[in-house]
Amino acid sequence: MTDTGWIDLALVSARPQAMGALLRYFRNLDLAEEAFQEACIRALKNWPRTGPPRDPAAWLIFVGRNSGIDKVRRQSRETALPPEELLSDLDDRESELADRLDGAHYRDDILRLLFVCSNPALPATQQIALALRIVSGLSVRQIARAFLVSEAAMEQRITRAKARVAAAGIPFETPDAVDRAERLAAVATMIYLVFNEGYSAMNGPEGVSADLCDEAIRLSRLLLRLFPAEPEMMGLTALLLLQHSRARARFDANGAVVLLEDQDRRLWSRPMITEALAMIDKAMRHRRPGPYQIQAAIAALHARAERPEQTDWEEIDLLYQALERLQPSPVVTLNRAVAVSKREGPEAALAMVEPLGERLSGYFYYHGLRGGLLKQLGRACEARTAFDRAIALATNASEAAYIRMQLDHLAAEPATVAEEEKR
């Protein structure tokens, strides 16, 4: 066979389960990863000749397990492997192993991997890097490029994360039912952080960091397959799809951010939106609202509006109020202020924004929104000061370009009498 694209797809699809099973066996991230890589090398060599195995994941686990055992035995006779009785499901021939990889094992092995990578003992940046490397299989070069750091720096970050996993004694077991809900929330947060890292790294049409967004959506779908009746997993996946559906419309030709209300909605991905809307409608029928469902419902209202003026700002305001009650945060209040500005005007919104200044003093979007509201109220000098602060806090060129455009508009507008008197 000359076309080996199917092999890459099979390896990517099988990776989470195979890595999870190998981690359960070896209790060591490095060894599990090396064993999986060796299995992949053998797959690339053998599968073009023999064709796909009945169960690629079982094949990779079987070959990886044997490769890892050989490596341990070669390196040191003192290295102890886990007791055989704990791992009877991995001690069969490949054909028998495939029969044993039922739904329960599939879920537990993948959850094990996700729980290790999203453990709260790891800083958020290490959680993201470890998940992208271990679960998604992105190369260190790909991850470093997405984070805008050197390969050496990213290699160190991943190494530190693995060392912290070992030092903290992070368990390689799947948690019991009592702990599972809390751990699932941590996994969802990690996936959302992966998406946000890609979303915020987008820097104009040619610099869109879509890899991280795509990986986050893939991980979210994976989690949803494990828990298909969990409404918050539906909400998370729907939210990511709705946000990513607008990727092509987020920047103008000069690379500046285009606000949601100014975006060309013809560029939005209708297939993503259609899938997400069906998903959030299904989630809401469970009547167990959570933060991701509410955020997805807000994004859905924007997606359903064919034109900006059709946006249901009253409903968006109510949803943000619900989110404030469920998950109080100055950022949630800041976002709600946008809805209030559309309903009641900039003065009412500014009254909500001003008290947030101390807690959000280092937040780009706080100063950007405040500057915009002051600009609408004709308070140009104050708006200029807010915009200057926003530029200083911009995390990428597209954010800075948008604020500079606002400053240019201010410079072109005639000053009010009150502003002239201040000069």
Curated annotation (Swiss-Prot):
Pfam families named among the record's database cross-references: DUF6596 (PF20239), Sigma70_r2 (PF04542), Sigma70_r4_2 (PF08281)
Protein source organism: Rhizobium meliloti (strain 1021)
UniProt-listed PANTHER family: BLL0085 PROTEIN, BLL6612 PROTEIN-RELATED
Record-annotated disulphide pairs: none
A GO biological-process term: DNA-templated transcription initiation
Domain of life: Bacteria
Signal peptide boundaries: none
Molecular-function annotations in GO: DNA binding; sigma factor activity
InterPro entries given in the database record: DUF6596, RNA_pol_sigma-70_dom, RNA_pol_sigma70_r2, RNA_pol_sigma70_r4_t2, RNA_pol_sigma_r2, RNA_pol_sigma_r3/r4-like, TPR-like_helical_dom_sf, WH-like_DNA-bd_sf
Protein name per UniProt: Uncharacterized protein R00370
